[in-house]
Curated annotation (Swiss-Prot):
Keywords of the record: Antibiotic, Antimicrobial, Defensin, Disulfide bond, Secreted, Signal
Keyword Signal appears in the UniProt entry: yes
Gene: DEFB107A
A GO CC annotation given for this chain: extracellular region
Organism placement in taxonomy: Eukaryota, Metazoa, Chordata, Craniata, Vertebrata
Source species, domain of life: Eukaryota
Name by which UniProt lists this protein: Beta-defensin 107A
Primary localization class, coarse: secreted
Length: 70
């Protein structure tokens, strides 16, 4: 019985690690999309930047882009 508990614990830990890896991949993908839009991912945009949203990473939820002068 103790062997089965150890295996269950390791499988559970592996699933948690896999979930973290897939979240990191999507955050990197969204950061690349923001880069293509000539923006960058930040927690807060500066006053002369516009929030376009889209990064959705835990620490950097916004894609900030410079405002265009009209």
């Amino acid at each position: 019985m103790p062997g089965a508990m150890k295996i269950f614990f390791f499988i559970f830990a592996a699933l948690i690690l896999l979930a973290q890896i897939f979240q990191a991949r999507t955050a990197i993908h969204r950061a690349l999309i923001s880069k293509r839009m000539e923006g960058h991912c930040e927690a807060e945009c500066l006053t002369f930047e516009v929030k376009t949203g889209g990064c959705r990473a835990e620490l950097a939820p916004f894609c900030c882009k410079n405002r265009k002068k009209h």
